[in-house]
Amino acid sequence: MEMLQGLLLWLLLNVGGVWASRGPLRPLCRPINATLAAENEACPVCVTFTTTICAGYCPSMVRVLPAILPPMPQPVCTYHELHFASIRLPGCPPGVDPMVSFPVALSCRCGPCRLSNSDCGGPRAQPLACDRPPLPGLLFL
């Protein structure tokens, strides 16, 4: 009887783990469209634009006994292939570079967070907050 209970518990945990990691409520790491903002302190406006970023769920594990073993690295959804695009901020005074470059995700992967091409800080309360008045309506993909 104990063996049957152990087998049932093992089955439930494994099936539940597979369901949770592949469930419809957790979209996997992939490129998605996002609206971002760009500004320069010397220019009079903030420009919003649409680009492709990496977002989604990456399977991860947490140690049961964290005090005994070091923490496991947690993968994040990050760029696999990308190219850079640029926009020009209007109204910048002479001598100020009006160009702002940004990454455009072509494909994504789960891996370690690299500060050289990713923001590893997590979600922001106001990702589009600008200090300058907005100039909406630009679309870049």
Curated annotation (Swiss-Prot):
Q: Where is the signal peptide?
A: 1-20
Q: Which cysteines are joined by disulfide bonds?
A: C29-C77, C43-C92, C46-C130, C54-C108, C58-C110, C113-C120
Q: Name one GO biological process term.
A: G protein-coupled receptor signaling pathway
Q: What is this protein called?
A: Lutropin subunit beta
Summarize subunit and interaction data from the UniProt record for this chain.
Answer: Heterodimer of a common alpha chain and a unique beta chain which confers biological specificity to thyrotropin, lutropin, follitropin and gonadotropin.
- The source's domain of life comes to Eukaryota
Q: Which residues are glycosylated?
A: N33
What is the recorded function of this protein according to its Swiss-Prot or TrEMBL entry? Promotes spermatogenesis and ovulation by stimulating the testes and ovaries to synthesize steroids.
- GO cellular component annotations, sorted alphabetically? cytoplasm; extracellular space
One Pfam family from the UniProt entry? Cys_knot
Q: Which GO terms describe its molecular function?
A: hormone activity
Query: Per its UniProt record, what CDD domains does this chain match?
Result: GHB_like
SMART domains registered for this protein in UniProt: GHB
Q: Which family does it belong to?
A: Belongs to the glycoprotein hormones subunit beta family.
User: Sorted alphabetically, which keywords does the UniProt record give?
Assistant: Disulfide bond, Glycoprotein, Hormone, Secreted, Signal
Q: Where in the cell is it found?
A: Secreted
- Which InterPro entries does UniProt cross-reference here? Cystine-knot_cytokine, Glyco_hormone_CN, Gonadotropin_bsu, Gonadotropin_bsu_CS
